[in-house]
């Protein structure tokens, strides 16, 4: 790969991390990321550089570590039912929002 690709990935990661500073809520970041990801999935990006840049952006913006830590705390409290419910809700809601972004993208184009 050329150095130019690495610079683009780095810039996408910086932008995503910068945006993350303004939104300090893991759930909202996850919803926004899922919506945008669903929107861009439909674009069927043909260039690998675009795919790589978007991967870098979404990896930094929607870091799943915040949810994992939240689920870890719930699990350590011993509330297994709450853990199972939250884990499933997080996955289901994000999938639905991602599909909604995909649907919006289809309606626009």
UniProtKB/Swiss-Prot annotation:
Positions in coiled-coil regions: none
Entry's localization field: Cell inner membrane
BP GO terms, sorted: monoatomic ion transmembrane transport
Catalytic activity from the UniProt record: fluoride(in) = fluoride(out)
Transmembrane domains' residue ranges: 21-41, 52-72, 84-104
Pfam families linked to this entry: CRCB
Signal peptide per UniProt: none
InterPro entries to which the protein is assigned, alphabetical: FluC (IPR003691)
Entry keyword set: Cell inner membrane, Cell membrane, Ion channel, Ion transport, Membrane, Transmembrane, Transmembrane helix, Transport
Highest taxon of the lineage: Bacteria
Keyword Plastid: no
Membrane topology listed for this record: Multi-pass membrane protein
GO cellular component, one term: plasma membrane
Family: Belongs to the fluoride channel Fluc/FEX (TC 1.A.43) family.
Function: Fluoride-specific ion channel. Important for reducing fluoride concentration in the cell, thus reducing its toxicity.
Identification of the protein by name: Fluoride-specific ion channel FluC 1
Source species of the chain: Prochlorococcus marinus (strain MIT 9312)
Lineage: Bacteria, Bacillati, Cyanobacteriota, Cyanophyceae, Synechococcales
Name of the gene encoding the protein in the UniProt record: fluC1
